[in-house]
Structures are given as C-alpha cells and as structure tokens.
Amino acid sequence: MMSVTVETLENLERKVVLSLPWSEINAETDKKLKQTQRRAKIDGFRPGKAPLKMIAQMYGASAQNDVINELVQRRFYDVAVAQELKVAGFPRFEGVEEQDDKESFKVAAIFEVFPEVVIGDLSAQEVEKVTASVGDAEVDQTVEILRKQRTRFNHVEREARNGDRVIIDFEGKIDGEPFAGGASKNYAFVLGASQMLPEFEAGVVGMKAGESKDVTVNFPEDYHGKDVAGKTAVFTITLNNVSEATLPEVDADFAKALGIADGDVAKMREEVQKNVSREVERRVNEQTKESVMNALLKAVELKAPVALVNEEAARLANEMKQNFVNQGMADAANLDLPLDMFKEQAERRVSLGLILAKLVDENKLEPTEEQIKAVVANFAESYEDPQEVIDWYYADPSRLQAPTSLAVESNVVDFVLGKAKVNEKALSFDEVMGAQA
C-alpha cells in the first residue's frame, strides 16, 4: 500500500487522501458487470445472454460508482489500521479537485479521531458523599403515605372542607364571555390538594351540595394557558356532592393489602423499612455518583468527538419520542426534535463514556461476575418472584448490559472516593425522597 499523509484539521478532525488505481477500479467494474450479465433479463435475449457491451452501456456508470464506493471504504479501513488511527464515528468522503495523476482516482476522507484521555490528579478533586438513614420515624411517614394512597371517600351532608372530595359544575367567563376550557360538568377534585387555583378552591370551601355561587379568580401571569394568563375570570360554581376522606386503620387488613399474607403488622413495617431503605440507598448512591462524575469531568480536559456527540443527541431524541409514544402520543414518532436540545447532555455522556473507559482500563475496574450478579439480585429483590427476574436476565446475555454498566460505575465511584477529597453530606429522609432520581 502506498504511504498516505494524515493531515490534522481542526480539533479532532483529520484528513487523508486515498488513491484508487484506475486499473483496479476498471478490473473490479468489469467483474461486477459480468456478474450483472449473468443475472440480467433483457428483451430480445435469453436470461444471461445479453452482450457484455450492452450491459456496460446500461449499467456501467452505476457499477463503477458502486466499485469506487466499495474501494474507498476498504482503502480507508486499511489506512486506519496501518496508521493506527482510532476513528470516531463514520468518515465522510469528498472528491478531490486536483486529479493530477491519470493512473489513479483520488478521494479525500475526513474523519475524527478519539481524543487522548489523560486522567488528572483525582486527589485534588472534591467529591460529595451523600448519606441518609431510615428509622421508625421514616417508616411511620411512609405508612402514612400508604394510608393516604388507600383513602376512601364517603358522602356527607355538610359544608365542604379542606381534604374533602367535591364534585362540581362550573362555568367561567372573562369580561362576560366564556373561554376555552373554562367550563365542566361533574368535575371531581380534592380540596387542599392544589389541583385548582387557590382562589377557586377557597370559593368552594364552606359550600353545601345544591348551592351555587360566583367566585372571582385571577389567573397568574405565568399560567400555562396563555389565553387566560394574567386575566380575571368569574366562575359560576354549583356544588353537587361532598365526600369525606377516611383513612384505613393500620391493622391486619391493611397489612394484607400490602402483601403480608398473615396480616402481621410488624412484618409489614419490616417490609416497608426494607423497601424504603433500598430506595433511599439507590437515591443517595445516585447523588454520590453524580458528584463523582462531575469531579471526573473537572479532572480531565477533553473535547468530545462531534460525530459521537451528534449520534448520542440523535439517540436521546429518539428515546424522548419513544417515551412520548409509550405515553399515548401516537404522532410523537413524527416529531422533529432539534438535536441542539440534546447536545449538552450528549456531550456530557460521550465525555464521561471516554473517561470511564480509560479509568476502567488503566485501573482494572472491570466488574466480576459476582458484582454483576449482585446488581441483578438487587434489581430482582423488589419483585414478587425475584428468581424469575434473575432467570430472565440470564436467559439472554444482552440483558446483562445494564447491570454490567451499573457494576462498572459502582467500581469507578468506589475508586474515585478512595482517591478524592470526600465531604460527607447527611440528608434528611424528605430531602432524599424529594430529589429527582
């Protein structure tokens, strides 16, 4: 193979000029045309018997284009291997204006290479390790939430109070005119749950079934309905029904409803503590991991390959569209989401992927089979039949990709925590459970 020069363009972009001998192009084109001849069905000739000259006239140009494309791809691969180029993404090929060599056809390949990743001094980085505990008070709080989730509403003949579920008819007008979305029949909501604007709810409190009244409501300037934002409406409200909330007692029936077969309340509390502890642990680990990843990004000066960032942005866009489809938005698959929306997140992911790969390779942080099994077991623990979930993961090796990635990340977090300056941060139960995770 003739030597080629790799030209450095901007940042990670490189360029090589590939020379394809016309003798090779012509030979490969002839071979392709002969293959086409054997398959061709042309009027006036038996299948495969049309003259090669006719085949060349009909298919010669497209055959030559196919050959050039194939040779370019092959030659670029050979050059990348010979030059030990770590190509990121796919190259783009461009014609070369100066075709000064009549013996060959020249094509320029423009591509990006992976950046050199140099891990900085991790001991200079500060990392926040988040901690939280789950005790009796947190179990009590969770049990109370579970009680509220099983609230029963019973009809009462009295005025409406906060906490009641009410059913109303309402019609709103702005400057005496009805507006879109301003009216409804038999609309149910819970007073005090912030489902309606505060002035609207306050107007219903104290009403009895069968009563009607006008309530003035000022829509906030930042209200999601732009047509009514900042305007004042008068709602005519008729109260149809009032129901009082009743919470279940924490007894054997309640425990059975939560899956404790014998109705043992103590067992139920143990199960609640175990489940809540698992969720709290997951959330604090996520926050610690986020701090570790931020520290790694600070420790490494890195320019992510544009091609990989674009690929990741496209993947994130498709992921969002699929989520919309799964939520019932059938037309979401055709949404044209601008990739710029995802560029920042994509660049972060690509950069972290490169950093983690380097860190894992340099420090032998690949997870063991036991670590992967532990992650799978942790996934399975929250299901009714954990062994069925474990068997599902191990039935197809591709399903182990997610547990393996989590095990890798866990090893990286432990490694960085052992190197960096660690500041422990204790969070309350409410702070942990209120965090996005």
From Swiss-Prot:
<dbReference type="Pfam" id="PF05698">
    <property type="entry name" value="Trigger_C"/>
</dbReference>
<dbReference type="GO" id="GO:0003755">
    <property type="term" value="F:peptidyl-prolyl cis-trans isomerase activity"/>
</dbReference>
<keyword id="KW-0963">Cytoplasm</keyword>
<keyword id="KW-0697">Rotamase</keyword>
<keyword id="KW-0143">Chaperone</keyword>
<dbReference type="InterPro" id="IPR037041">
    <property type="entry name" value="Trigger_fac_C_sf"/>
</dbReference>
<dbReference type="GO" id="GO:0051301">
    <property type="term" value="P:cell division"/>
</dbReference>
<keyword id="KW-0413">Isomerase</keyword>
<dbReference type="GO" id="GO:0005737">
    <property type="term" value="C:cytoplasm"/>
</dbReference>
<dbReference type="InterPro" id="IPR008880">
    <property type="entry name" value="Trigger_fac_C"/>
</dbReference>
<dbReference type="Pfam" id="PF05697">
    <property type="entry name" value="Trigger_N"/>
</dbReference>
<dbReference type="InterPro" id="IPR005215">
    <property type="entry name" value="Trig_fac"/>
</dbReference>
<dbReference type="InterPro" id="IPR027304">
    <property type="entry name" value="Trigger_fact/SurA_dom_sf"/>
</dbReference>
<dbReference type="GO" id="GO:0043335">
    <property type="term" value="P:protein unfolding"/>
</dbReference>
<dbReference type="InterPro" id="IPR008881">
    <property type="entry name" value="Trigger_fac_ribosome-bd_bac"/>
</dbReference>
<dbReference type="GO" id="GO:0051083">
    <property type="term" value="P:'de novo' cotranslational protein folding"/>
</dbReference>
<dbReference type="InterPro" id="IPR036611">
    <property type="entry name" value="Trigger_fac_ribosome-bd_sf"/>
</dbReference>
<dbReference type="GO" id="GO:0015031">
    <property type="term" value="P:protein transport"/>
</dbReference>
<comment type="similarity">
    <text>Belongs to the FKBP-type PPIase family. Tig subfamily.</text>
</comment>
<keyword id="KW-0131">Cell cycle</keyword>
<dbReference type="GO" id="GO:0043022">
    <property type="term" value="F:ribosome binding"/>
</dbReference>
<dbReference type="GO" id="GO:0044183">
    <property type="term" value="F:protein folding chaperone"/>
</dbReference>
<keyword id="KW-0132">Cell division</keyword>
<dbReference type="GO" id="GO:0061077">
    <property type="term" value="P:chaperone-mediated protein folding"/>
</dbReference>
<comment type="function">
    <text>Involved in protein export. Acts as a chaperone by maintaining the newly synthesized protein in an open conformation. Functions as a peptidyl-prolyl cis-trans isomerase.</text>
</comment>
<dbReference type="InterPro" id="IPR001179">
    <property type="entry name" value="PPIase_FKBP_dom"/>
</dbReference>
<protein>
    <recommendedName>
        <fullName>Trigger factor</fullName>
        <ecNumber>5.2.1.8</ecNumber>
    </recommendedName>
</protein>
<dbReference type="InterPro" id="IPR046357">
    <property type="entry name" value="PPIase_dom_sf"/>
</dbReference>
<feature type="domain" description="PPIase FKBP-type">
    <location>
        <begin position="163"/>
        <end position="248"/>
    </location>
</feature>
<dbReference type="Pfam" id="PF00254">
    <property type="entry name" value="FKBP_C"/>
</dbReference>
